[in-house]
Each structure stands twice: as structure tokens, then as C-alpha cells.
A protein has these predicted regions:
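A short, exposed helix-loop element centered on a Lys and neighboring polar residues
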Residues: 159-160, 204
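Active-site loop of short-chain dehydrogenase/reductase
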Residues: 118-119, 166-179, 214-215
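C-terminal helical subdomain
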Residues: 204, 212-268
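Conserved glycine-rich Rossmann-like NAD(P)H-binding loop of the short-chain dehydrogenase/reductase
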Residues: 66-79
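Rossmann-fold cofactor-recognition segment
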Residues: 85-103
Length: 268
């Protein structure tokens, strides 16, 4: 069953980045947190989960015993994906949300955290909308605003909603998945060139800030499209790469393949 939640503003208080890592309190800002002595299921939350990369990552982490929270806009599709994963023995649930509504996204992640177990791995990988991939001189203010909401406000809300738990238990992983415009702007794709650059800066700052607390933040750059059967860009290959990034916990940026001279992007 897909879980649906309306936008809810979280309680006022310090942000997760302002909170020291503690090991002796039962809750943070009203949300229950397990003590370090209590056994618990580790959950990966995949924001932008679909039949391609999202499903492959869910299976890869699910094989290792992780519960999987699948977040997407389309209720029917995420419900079907969750059912398929459950049939394979993976503890998966679908959650309907919109990354352009930061309050709703944050609340949905909090509900997944409370229902499935602590979210200790967050993957932010929704495919950009077509309006974000217009040429520079055709890109409007509304187009740019949508891209920023999608790629900056969404990640900010998602990270802050799970970071309290990660800092409390003293570990966590945040994985960003981007196209080639994250590192090389392309006038043909103005929206993602602007917003992915900002997301990359945010992710790099998170990496540098949270590394001393064993919270690993990393970015996978996939130049061009995800391609089934491709030796480096097949969904299962990319899922293995993301698993390795989670377990190795070393470098910030990983390229799925070398950058071509011409940047290409994929959209929904």
C-alpha cells in the first residue's frame, strides 16, 4: 500500500546541522530515535524511485538486509514496484511525495523513518523534468525556479529530515545522482546546468562538514543516459557502484564513465 501525506511544516527549532551528536536522549525534536543498544532495521530512502536505477538500487541494498523506502510522485507505479520487491523478499514500501514541495517531502521521510526504521542511507536521484532541459535563451524564470526547487530545495529538505537520526546514531550515507551538467554546464540544458551546479556545491559542503561524524556524502555523475546493457551505465552496474560508494566511504565524486565532449541529459 502506498502511503500518502499532505504537506506538514515540521516543528520550529534548530536545524540538524546545529545539533550535536548525542547518544543518551530518546528523541530529537519530538521524533522517536532508537538508542544505540536497541537492534533496528537500517533503511535506505530512495527519492525518485523508478523501474530503472531506483529498482536496481533497492534490490542491491535489499540483498544486504536494508529496508527500502521508495519515494515517487506516481502512486500506481511506486505501489507496483514496492509489490514486486516485496515478492522478492525485500522489505519495501512506497511513499507518494513531490520533491518540489519541501514540507511534504520532509514529512514523508519522517513517516518512512518512523514506520520502516531509521533512514541511515538517503539517495536523491529523481529524473529532471523536460522543462529543465531547454536551451539557455528559451529558459524562463519559471523554468529556472522549478529546476532550483527540484535540485536544491528538495535535497535540502530531504537531508535535514534524516540528518538528525544519522547524527544521533553516529553514521549515515547521503548519495546524490546527477547527469553530466553537474560538472560541465551546457547551454542546451540550462535548467540542470544551473541547478545541478548548485546541488553539487551543496553536496560537496555536506561531504566536508559531515565526514568527521562518519556521515559520508557522495555524488555519482552519470554522463548521458542510463542504458540497459551498457558496461558502465546499466542500472545494475550503477547500483553496484552506489553500493561501493556507500561501503568504501572515501571520495566525494565518482564518474560512471568518462565525460564526452558533448553533454547529454535524460528527463522524465
Amino acid at each position: 500500500m502506498v502511503h500518502r501525506f499532505a504537506a506538514t511544516i515540521l516543528p520550529d527549532g534548530p536545524s540538524a546541522l546545529d545539533l550535536p551528536c548525542q547518544v543518551n536522549r530518546p528523541s530529537v525534536e519530538g521524533y522517536p530515535i532508537p538508542t544505540l543498544e536497541e537492534p533496528h532495521v537500517t533503511t535506505i530512502a530512495i527519492v525518485g524511485a523508478g523501474r530503472g536505477l531506483g529498482a536496481a538500487v533497492a534490490r542491491r541494498f535489499g540483498r544486504e538486509g536494508h529496508a527500502v523506502a521508495l519515494l515517487a510522485r506516481n502512486a500506481e507505479r511506486v505501489d507496483a514496484l514496492a509489490a514486486d520487491l516485496q515478492a522478492e523478499g525485500i522489505d519495501a514500501r512506497g511513499w507518494v511525495t513531490d520533491v518540489r514541495d519541501p514540507d511534504a517531502l520532509a514529512r514523508t521521510l519522517e513517516q518512512a523513518n518512523e514506520t520502516q526504521g531509521p533512514v541511515e542511507v538517503l539517495q536523491y536521484s529523481p529524473l529532471p523534468q523536460k522543462s529543465f532541459l531547454r536551451p539557455l535563451l528559451e529558459t524562463t524564470v519559471d523554468d529556472a525556479r522549478g529546476a532550483i526547487e527540484f535540485s536544491v530545495y528538495g535535497p535540502l529538505a530531504a537531508v535535514h529530515s534524516v540528518l538528525q537520526n544519522m547524527r544521533f546514531v553516529g553514521k549515515g550515507t547521503v548519495l546524490f545522482v546527477n547527469g553530466g551538467t553537474a560538472v560541465r554546464p551546457a547551454p542546451k540544458f540550462a535548467g540542470t546546468s544551473l541547478s545541478f551546479a548548485a546541488q553539487s556545491a551543496y553536496a560537496q559542503m555536506l561531504h566536508d562538514t559531515l565526514a568527521p561524524e562518519d556521515i559520508h556524502v557522495a555524488q555519482l555523475v552519470i554522463p548521458g543516459a542510463i542504458e540497459e546493457g551498457h558496461p558502465q551505465k546499466d542500472p545494475e552496474v550503477l547500483a553496484e557502484t552506489l553500493w561501493s560508494m556507500h561501503t568504501r566511504r572515501d571520495e566525494f565524486r565518482v564518474f560512471a564513465t568518462e565525460m564526452d565532449d558533448e553533454v547529454r541529459e535524460t528527463a522524465t
